[in-house]
Amino acid sequence: SLGRFSLTDADIRYTYYGKSDSLQHQKFDTTNLFVEGLAVDTRLRTYKLDDIRFSTRNLAFPLDGGFYTLKVGGVDLTRSSAVIDRIRLVSPFPKMQFAYLQPHHKDWFDVSVGQVSLTDIDLPSYFSEKVLRIADVQVSDVVLQNLKNQKIPVSRHIVPMIYTGLQKAPVKLDFQRVKVKNFSVVYEELSKKGTVPGKLFFTDMNGRFTGFTNIVSRPDQYIVLDADGKLMGKGAFTATWKLPVDSLNDRFLLNARLDSFDLTALNELLLPLASVEVRSGQVREMTFSTEASSKGATVNMLFLYNDLKATLLKEKDGEPTDRKFLTSLVNRILKHDNPDKARQGGDKLRHSSVSIIRDPYHSTFNYLWQILRPPLIESVGMSKKKQDTAKEIMTFFAKVKNFFRGKKNVSGKNIPEGEGKDVLLLEFEPINN
């Protein structure tokens, strides 16, 4: 038990052994701590606290062997609430060089969070039941940036679904309300032969979680995320994502809608990564729903658009040049409108319904792209059957080509099919502490 303890305006400094057994120095600036009426009985697992106040400034914690530093501007804790300001995950290395320097060639990340506010923290239940219960969590002004550099080969490994981290967390969590305000994601990807990364970004996102917990209390229990935002800063979208609480329930659900989007905005992504330029195209409405597991998914999509035209490019003398024959061929195959205009065969809507098998060697974010890609391509004129046939033909020709050329990587080993090609990955990898 502790009757009263007070610490005011303390500067706390400490050292520890960090990367390569080097001595690291840390400090807590302007630290204040006041505790009154603390009583803990470990045998009876009871906890009593009359009052607690804690504040400190300018924290810094190294992560990932020193390749990142987690910086916190300030922490203010009262008896049942806390505010954490100016959170930043930064790397001392430039983003274009990061993956070369990181031992496992991981992706570069940069994360900033304006503020995290926690209200009605139930400290007694944490000490007595080992459950962290919080009535309200507010997160604001979040920016997540990520660069994937395909020029650097990485070892393949099976990537678990994103929600398994919460399911297996060492602490039981039960948050009644979680809201995220003004969240932006900027994803960049540099192709094997590219010089400029392609960019995909989501801005002005707001989200609300209900049932945010990893405590299983009933069958078929889900965390529900309702979100809205803008694709490429232009297309307004809404989405509902249901994530399983129970690790034995290998099933998630996702429904989304996108309204009024200019497809030429995707050229920031497509030009650097796929040498494809959307010349014109306007989305009137896109809706999709998917039921998925860690093994595969089924998806239904309605993609309504007008005047879709594209150009296939190749680099010549350092400049992108129209591959006129292939461009003409592609635009003959493409359905320029959905529904087709009257002269193209009537106004019948084209719906797409397909099933896919997940490639488990990529992240959950990439898996969503795996789910969306087949129905999108089917909607603009190429059925899933034709896509699979084309893939088989390309694989066959790749095998023949590799057989006669003896295609090898830098280590002298044969490259498996699909490994030596530029492919659009669209994925986030987690940062390991």
Question: Where are the regions that the model predicts?
Answer:
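Short, T/G/N/S-enriched strand-turn elements that build extracellular solenoid repeat scaffolds
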Residues: 127-129
